[in-house]
Regions:
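Short, well-formed alpha-helical segments that are part of the catalytic scaffolds
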Residues: 11-26
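Short beta-strand/loop segment that forms part of the nucleotide-sugar
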Residues: 6, 19-20, 30-40, 57
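Acidic donor-binding loop at a coil-to-helix junction in glycosyltransferase catalytic cores
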Residues: 161-167
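Glycine-rich, basic loop-to-helix element that forms the pyrophosphate-binding segment
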Residues: 59-75
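Short aromatic/hydrophobic "clamp" motif used to bind/position activated sugar donors
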Residues: 80
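Hydrophobic helical membrane-anchoring modules
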Residues: 172-232
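A conserved acidic beta->alpha catalytic loop
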Residues: 38-46, 87
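Conserved donor NDP-sugar-binding/catalytic core segment of glycosyltransferases
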Residues: 91-119
Length: 232
């Protein structure tokens, strides 16, 4: 059975649709709970989520890694599925995850698609079918057995950015990782707010700085300097 964990901070515009899509596309009723791990939203995120009858935990520490770990600590099922608040899984996602786990994959993700049509974004998404770490990000969602999640110590809370890169690298050392060839649908809002090509350039710059060993503080300061941030 699956526990879905969604980290949130001021996501009132997206959270209801994401929750509803999860329930709707869980065709075999494998999702037993949705846990909203909120980082202290000042809008109606919690109110919107409460209206959908999901579990809500208010995290003592804000930050995606810390919130996902905190949400996972409340999970009651053997499979954890981490989904961003502005990302919706594909139809039949839960059975796809179950099939992957039963086939010996202890962790994995889906391909990516955006809610805005642009040739560059489509090309970007096409490459997410390949198992290349440079194009593996949290927007693609992440499923993992609770056992393996705990074995790697969860998300590294020192990682303010690229926490998904870190945990996937750790998981690949101890388990088989797969990419399910169906796309999640995620918001293109950062691309539209900052410019598609500029945003992609920023993402790759931050990734390569990460690979070169720059500190999280340097990555975050560079990111915030270059991109318009409404929430973080």
């Amino acid at each position: 059975m699956i526990s879905v964990i969604i980290p949130t901070y001021n996501e009132e515009a997206h959270i209801k649709a994401t929750i509803n899509r999860i329930w709707e596309y869980d065709e075999e009723n494998l999702v037993r709970e949705i846990i909203i791990a909120d980082g202290g939203s000042t809008d109606n995120t919690v109110k919107e989520a409460e209206a959908e009858g999901v579990n809500i935990v208010v995290c003592p520490t804000k930050g995606r890694a810390a919130q996902m770990n905190y949400g996972a600590s409340y999970a009651n099922n053997s499979i954890l599925y981490f989904v961003h608040a502005d990302t919706q899984p594909p139809n039949g996602f839960s059975s796809d995850i179950g099939t992957a786990i039963n086939s010996g994959y202890n962790a994995g993700c889906f391909m990516l698609s955006f809610d805005y049509h642009h040739w560059f974004l489509k090309a970007n998404c096409w490459f997410t079918r390949f198992d290349v770490n440079a194009i593996r990000f949290g927007d693609q969602s992440l499923f993992v057995t609770k056992e393996k999640f705990e074995q790697v110590g969860g998300f590294c809370e020192k990682h303010i950015v690229l926490e998904d890169q870190h945990i996937i690298n750790q998981l690949k050392k101890i388990s088989r990782f797969t990419i399910i060839k169906k796309p999640v649908l995620t918001s293109a809002r950062k691309y539209l707010e900052n410019g598609i090509f500029k945003t992609q350039g920023i993402f790759f710059l931050i990734y390569f700085m990460y690979r070169l060993g720059y500190s999280q503080q340097k990555l975050v300061s560079t990111y915030r300097k270059l991109i318009q941030q409404n929430k973080h």
